Amino acid sequence: MAKKPVTPASKVAAKQAAVRSRHQEDVFTLDPLIDPIFQKGELRSYLVTEPSPSVLKKRSIHTKEYWMLSSLLLIAFYVRMYNLSNPNSVVFDEVHFGGFARKYILGTFFMDVHPPLAKMLFGAVGAIGGFKGDFEFKSIGDKFPDSTPYIFMRQFPALLGVGTVILCYLTLRQSGVRPIIAYITTFLLIIENSNVTISRYILLDSPLIFFIAAAIYAWKKFEIQIPFTFGWYRSLLATGIALGLALSSKWVGLFTVAWVGFLCIYQLWFLIGDLSVSTKKIWGHFFARGIILLGVPIALYLGFFAIHFQLLNKEGDGGAFMSSAFRAGLQGNKIPRDITEQVGLGSVVTIRHVDTQGGYLHSHEHFYQTGSKQQQITLYPHLDSNNKWLIEPYNGTIHNETFVPLINGMKIRLKHINTGRRLHSHDEKPPVSERDWQKECSCYGYDGFAGDANDDWVVEIVNYRSQKGEAQTFVKAINTIFRLRHAMTGHYLFSSEVKLPEWGFGQQEVTSASQGKRALTHWYIETNENSILPPSEAKIINYPKLSLWQKVVESHKRMWKINQGLTSHHHWQSSPSEWPLLLRGINYWNKEHKQVYLLGNAVTWWAATLSIITFGTYVLVTVFRWHLGTPLSTNKHVFNFNVQTFSYVLGWALHYLPFFIMGRQLFLHHYLPALYFGILALGHFFEIFTGYLTSRSKYFQQVAFVLVGLFSILSLVFYVNYSSLIYGTPWTKASCELTKPFSGWDYNCGTFFDTLGEYDIQEKSLASESEIPTETVVVEAKQTPKAEPKLAKQDDHIESPAAAEPVEEKEVKEEVEQLAPPLAVDFEEETPKVEDPQVADVDASSNDEKSVEEKQQQEQQQEQEQVEDESVHQVQQ
């Protein structure tokens, strides 16, 4: 039989038909997997690790998939952008991160527990939107003025939330999931309530999860590239960049870096066992991954901190957490300048503690209520005349003829300028600390008293912390770190974070100690005046300019300290053990009979948790059977399921389990990065369930797809039923009560009206109120007090608040509470306004006596009013 001639037209038609067939197969029945290749070795078979070129082709996005991606994009855009203008007031941590964006625009320095990138991005978006920093984001429920582009600022995290959705789909495709399953799983992420909520407000979670999702996608793309090709290096570099962005947004990004690191080790182990890979290539893998995956994130992290310091170049409330050397580089600082370097007998100095931010060695005309009941010695954070001490010889008077420098090993006395008493220690129990190795320090003496041996202190220079050279022999202002050893007891002048009670005005306790952290006995001289030293011989110095690395190190010490201090109870905090089961939510906003409450989509949430538990059980059973001699399956579907699901479960564990060892306040939103890994793992369970496990029967596969579809519908129903808590839209009490199966879901149904019609009445009432003309007063923008440490109580000689410097630091526990998430207001009540810290705590020690007099006057007035009331009552009778 003669063959029909093949014409060019028939070739084109056949090619087009093949393309059409391939595209249809790609979308609906495409198998993105290939069989793993095993080769025989001398002792056992080994896995060939180099990906086949066909894998990249099978898992690339095909033409018809763009329609699927477009639909996901539109749905995600609508879900996350819907009604962003509501609420039109501050929600939850917008208090902090909106306030931080404001400070980037104003350039005022602040301190936060998170790296700067996400906050800088919000600041940049605000600046692009025309925000001038005239709104403070002071309290939850504060209404945004027209001048604040809060909708524009909220659009940024919403867009990143949309981007996370697209990355989820692409990641699942790169890890071997069919398009239809990737579509369904991504749809679950779109309608996951907690992810929708956090992507609608000025919060760090949406940027963080987006960067983590980008790192996961880039890594999965990297895994299927042929080693040392352009695509391989490009994907590896993209992974490093995404890791750097995540790490620079929140320290949770460290867990993502650890995840990639573990997978690198895991893959290198198989590379070593692959006999087809040369030793040279193994070293190439090691160095390429190490340099790019560590070097790029570190470079980005430091670079963003450099930009952070450049932008925040003005003195602000955050300076109170930093050292004087750091603050000296900020514009508008009041750190002492032009200091005489040479310190000697007769110098009037201020002595600053090194390793706490308690401030200066200080005394005042107030006395301990325990122990010796002598004059108090404290650390005080303000510049103040009560910080000044005269350096005296221990055994005589000061000779005004010649300057005697202060040197290592010299015995001296320190005389308090304002009260004339000397720094003193003895065998008395400290006022607060109860350790037996600490003794009381006081100020002791009186007119005409020459002092005693308990006033004697020996100067010991700490060479390794002092500037090299003369500062290691002679005590130099700023440049010499020293200890003061009590000559009689051998104890060292010591201070920690312990605070004195109210009678000590909350100032930091100073004791002498024979043990404890050595660094807590380190001091330096900040200001120095000496009339004996000829002006021509005086060397004038200032704080040296800190390098970027020094600023980064100091900032991280403060960030870590503040983070560790977030230990006080918060009403909406929760335990990590509660997160996988979604036992607790967070009240974000509550006003005008509406509420925003962070709650996950329980259907998706519990399914992700179940998939994690199921995979863990499956691994244990498989390993047990393998030990009994059952070989591991090399079926391509099972093999890919094992490898990919293991990587996602590992990511879930690394982003979840570390929270169990953290002592700080924790909240449900801390679980969201782990949840993202759980959803990716859930997608692979859908894949194995609708594919391999039901592949023997088309009917069973159809049933499997129906079950997955019903699961998606159930998740959608949950999203719709609880959407009022996402968007802060009207709801009724009755509808709300039907949605509370657990006591931990403690959103307040009493917030809502009984009927939806009441909201229309409320809207009309609010609209009529807004039409009433009001005078707008433009005031100078203030620094948000939410990040400010409270002022320590000030001494009675200060005449006005303006005379006091901003406090360096309050007790860590109290300071960091200012950085903790605020409580959402209930109903229409406003959160109490924070008093101006420059006014609230002024002159507390002198006000104690005044407060007693005022109290007595109030009591007398109340008694007089009571008498008058009784008289009136008798007349009426």
UniProtKB/Swiss-Prot annotation:
The way this protein sits in the membrane is described as:
Multi-pass membrane protein
Q: Which CDD domains match?
A: beta-trefoil_MIR_PMT1-like (cd23283)
Name the GO cellular-component terms. Answer: endoplasmic reticulum; endoplasmic reticulum membrane; plasma membrane
The annotated region (Disordered) lies at 778-877
Q: Per the database record, which ranges form the MIR domain?
A: 340-394, 403-462, 472-528
Q: What is its EC number?
A: 2.4.1.109
On whether Kinase is a keyword of this UniProt record, the answer is: no
List the carbohydrate attachment sites: N83, N195, N395, N400, N721
One GO molecular function term? mannosyltransferase activity
PANTHER family attached to this UniProt entry: DOLICHYL-PHOSPHATE-MANNOSE--PROTEIN MANNOSYLTRANSFERASE, DOLICHYL-PHOSPHATE-MANNOSE--PROTEIN MANNOSYLTRANSFERASE 1-RELATED
> What is the official name of this protein in its record?
Dolichyl-phosphate-mannose--protein mannosyltransferase 1
Organism ancestry:
Eukaryota, Fungi, Dikarya, Ascomycota, Saccharomycotina
